[in-house]
Each structure stands twice: as C-alpha cells, then as structure tokens.
C-alpha cells in the first residue's frame, strides 16, 4: 500500500493538487481556510512519515510560535489591549494575526515537503522536461539540494565525531570547527552542481526534445480526481472574487462561528480539495485490510 498517496496517480494530477493548495492557502487571510489547509498539510506529512522520525515537523511549528509571539511587538493595531510594553500596546488582534500568518507559512512548507515526497524527479521531468528542459533541471537540483545537503552534513559531522573534533571545550575551537564544516559543505555543494551540469551537458541534455523512459498512463480515476479538483477550486476562487472569504483582523477580530454559519458550504469546497489524498489513503487502507483478511 502506497503511503505517498498520489504516487499511483498521474503526475499531472498530483502536481495540480499541490499547485491548487498553494494558491488557495496564499490567496486569503481567512482563518478557517488557513486552518483547513494546515490540518490537511500536516496530515499528509504525518502519514508520509509513518515509519520515520517526525522531528522535521517541529521546525515549521517553531516558526508559528515565533511569529505569534513577535508580531504584537511590531504591529500595535487592534482594539483589545492585553498589556503595554515600553509604552506600546500589545493587542490580541496582532497576536491572532501572527498566529494565522505562521500557520499559513507552515502550511506552505509542509506542502512543499509533501510535494517533494510525492512527485519525484522522474515525474517532474516527465511533465516539464520536453518544453522546459533547462528550467526543469534547475528546479530538480533545487528540490534535491536541501535533502542532499542535510545528508552530507550528517555524514561529515559523524566523521568529525569519530575523529573527536567535536570534543573541544573553548569557544574559539568550536567556532573554528563550525567554519571548517561550513566550508566543506559549501565546497561540496559547488562541486556537486558543477559535476551535474557537466554531466548533463556531455549527454546533450536540452539540445533536442527528449522522451521519458517511464510512461504514466492516464486512467479514469485521474480524470475524476482532476475534475473534482478543478471544480471545487474553481468554485472557491469564484467565491473569493465575490468577497465570501474576506476576513478582518483589525480593529477587532470577527467571529469564526459567524463566518461558518454565513458561508459554510464555501468552506466545504476547501475541505474536499484539501483532504482528497487523505480520503484516498483511507480508501486504500480499507481495501488493503479487506484483501489481507481474505488471505
């Protein structure tokens, strides 16, 4: 059973989902929309990392906490004053705005992580390699850079620990070790990029149109999923232009309950789009359990 959801779907369908989700979460400051997208993106990452360490999920949450705590010290708008700091009002509205801004950024980070796990380089080349070969190569290298950088950092740090270079006590020696480690990582990144570029140039990449070595057949399920994505997201953007998702944090925050009561069906559209992979995962889990029970 595939835990990466869209791996069994056509690459165009999976890419369309992530593009639409990014457009939805970044197109409005509506707290309900942001919360739905955040829950969906976190659920995606949790299920993708089912058997792996989940420490990577904490970093975006730290960013949410930082934005929540720091925004009131820079933005003093709002009518509900909690207290004064250096004769500046710290307002509840600024606190809430910082929290949902952090959720928006965290959702974007989780979606990019889920996209990287669901759409591999082969699928990315299949979609865009024929028309934009050079840009596709650059984007693929960018997507691979951070995971490779982290992997090489762990390997290099482990070697230094074996050589007991991390046992220095003075601050000067620790700083020298950190600079040396960063220099090695930077040199490796440049060398790796040059080797990749030279290798692709030697193979004639980008000179003529290239075909993909893997074929991805289009199925009826792909058509149904794409129509559902386009239909629900199209209805969302149409409602967005009419102001149905407008929300004001200042001078006073509006009631979330009132938002849902007035435009509840519009938020159902977001739930359908956001949780399509989760529903697909549950469906596959049920089918897998039934098949196992028949063995």
Where do the language-model regions lie?
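Interfacial helix-loop-helix linkers and transmembrane-helix boundary segments
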Residues: 35, 50-58
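Alpha-helical transmembrane segments and their membrane-interface exit regions
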Residues: 39-50, 63-68
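Short coil/turn helix-boundary motifs
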Residues: 9, 49-50, 131
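Juxtamembrane/interface alpha-helical elements of multi-pass membrane proteins
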Residues: 56-172, 286-295
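Transmembrane alpha-helix interface motif
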Residues: 2-46, 159-295
